[in-house]
């Protein structure tokens, strides 16, 4: 979700739906970008994404800027002509009714800002064109970004490794497309109107994303808990083994240990991270979580404010005013990670407009009272007999879950700390990745101290 913007690729629209090409022209090709470091200097970047374990969706990058309809379309910002042409053909070929006879000069498209793993556009019919049936007048076009073009962190990676990463990225997109279609059919996500190798057409939902400070509002927090519990209760046709979490951390750690920076400031920052003895920390974390009871459920894996929509017109409703989006990183995983990761996101504001483009406040981590409020709402939805338990049994269940999610919050910090170090090498986005990694590791060690582990 937050790896980078990329420009369109070469391939023309394909009507073959789920046929996913792994070739270089099948995915949007990133444009070469530069990133400004803390001193204001520009450093050229090799673009690329994150490599993932086979047969599992890719990991969720933490919430730097965000996806579907976060920001309104920019009326004065148009895509490049090639992207506009391809968008027109996709809409004309995949959408019914008035779209079928639409001329290209009648086609309206505008950029939606906020997507960093993908490019997002609003495509619409002009007011002068009448609807034929119940076809949508506006749709969201998502062009896949980094996930399809995963690359090793170092240029000296073997061709075999590069091909494997590319295959894994393509495989992840197939899985995500299947997942999106299933959730759409179950009315748990936006409707799916079209799918093709380079992206998809989705329902455009009038809404806005939540702000970080809204996560702590009691009614918002309770509904997020209920939505997450419903998500966790789903049966999905994916690998049920919880390999994603530690498989991803191991892969990131191996990449971090091979990283080389040319700038002295980056070299010193990397040395500081390596001084933490990250391999030993990972093994200690693995040992701790092995003895932490946490059911394996179908997890969102990126339930932060940018992936939660507040539906337009539902702002004053008591319930059913939120929708979870961006399922591309979902997988079977430990429940404690999904909830602990959500709690960690209370601390980070990614809307700050100056370097390093985020603000961290460790004091924003939910209090015991706020955690219990979330957990109570979660258990009421997730566990059918929870409300029939005695007060003592309910209290014991909630205490166990408090320990579970706060231990797994350590994994959230560790995962995104490693991820951000890797992004400092490969991302073209202007963001303080090394500073963000430091913030996550600072929070990791603070959480360890509080837990006494």
From Swiss-Prot:
Residue ranges with Pro residues bias: 55-73
Binding sites annotated in the UniProt record for phosphocholine: 115-117
SUPFAM superfamilies for this protein: Protein kinase-like (PK-like) (SSF56112)
Binding site for ATP: 113-119, 142, 203-209, 304, 326
Annotated catalysed reactions: choline + ATP = phosphocholine + ADP + H(+); ethanolamine + ATP = phosphoethanolamine + ADP + H(+)
Tissues in which the protein is found: Testis, brain, lung, kidney and liver.
UniProt-recorded name of the protein: Choline kinase alpha
Recorded name of the encoding gene: Chka
């Amino acid at each position: 979700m937050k790896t980078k913007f990329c420009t369109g690729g070469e391939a023309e629209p394909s009507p073959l739906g789920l046929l996913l090409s792994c070739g270089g022209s099948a995915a949007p090709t990133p444009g070469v970008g530069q990133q400004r470091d803390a001193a204001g200097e520009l450093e050229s970047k090799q673009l690329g994404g994150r490599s993932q374990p086979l047969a599992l969706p890719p990991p969720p990058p933490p919430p730097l800027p965000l996806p579907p309809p976060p920001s309104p379309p920019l009326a004065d910002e148009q895509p490049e002509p090639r992207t506009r042409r391809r968008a027109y053909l996709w809409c004309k070929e995949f959408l019914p009714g008035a779209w079928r006879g639409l001329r290209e000069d009648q086609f309206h498209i505008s950029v939606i800002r906020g997507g960093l793993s993908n490019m997002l556009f609003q495509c619409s019919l002009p007011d002068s064109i009448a609807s034929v049936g119940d076809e949508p007048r506006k749709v969201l076009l998502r062009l896949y970004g980094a996930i399809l073009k995963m690359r090793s962190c170092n240029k000296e990676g073997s061709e075999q490794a590069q091909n494997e990463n590319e295959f894994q990225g393509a495989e992840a997109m197939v899985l995500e497309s299947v997942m999106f279609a299933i959730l759409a059919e179950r009315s748990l996500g936006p409707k799916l109107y079209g799918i093709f190798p380079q992206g998809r057409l989705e329902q455009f939902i009038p809404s806005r994303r939540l702000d970080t400070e809204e996560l702590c509002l009691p009614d918002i927090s309770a509904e997020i808990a209920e939505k997450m519990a419903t998500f966790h209760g789903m049966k999905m046709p994916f690998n049920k083994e919880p390999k994603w979490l530690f498989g991803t951390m191991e892969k990131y750690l191996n990449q971090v240990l091979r990283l080389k920076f040319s700038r002295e400031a980056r070299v010193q920052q990397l040395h500081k991270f390596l001084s933490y003895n990250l391999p030993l920390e990972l093994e200690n974390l693995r040992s701790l979580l092995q003895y932490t009871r946490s059911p394996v459920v179908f997890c969102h894996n990126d339930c932060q404010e940018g992936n939660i929509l507040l539906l337009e017109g539902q702002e004053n409703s008591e319930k059913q005013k939120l929708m979870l989006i961006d399922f591309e990183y979902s997988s079977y995983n430990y429940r404690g990670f999904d909830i602990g990761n959500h709690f960690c996101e209370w601390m980070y504001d990614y809307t700050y407009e100056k370097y390093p483009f985020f603000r961290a406040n460790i004091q924003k981590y939910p209090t015991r009272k706020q955690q219990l409020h979330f957990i109570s709402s979660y258990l009421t939805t997730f566990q059918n007999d929870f409300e029939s338990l005695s007060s003592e049994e309910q209290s014991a269940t909630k205490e166990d879950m408090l320990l579970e999610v706060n231990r797994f919050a350590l994994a959230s910090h560790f995962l995104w700390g490693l991820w951000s170090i890797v992004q400092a090498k490969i991302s073209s986005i202007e963001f303080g990745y090394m500073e963000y990694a430091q913030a996550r590791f600072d929070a990791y060690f603070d959480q360890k101290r509080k837990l006494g582990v």
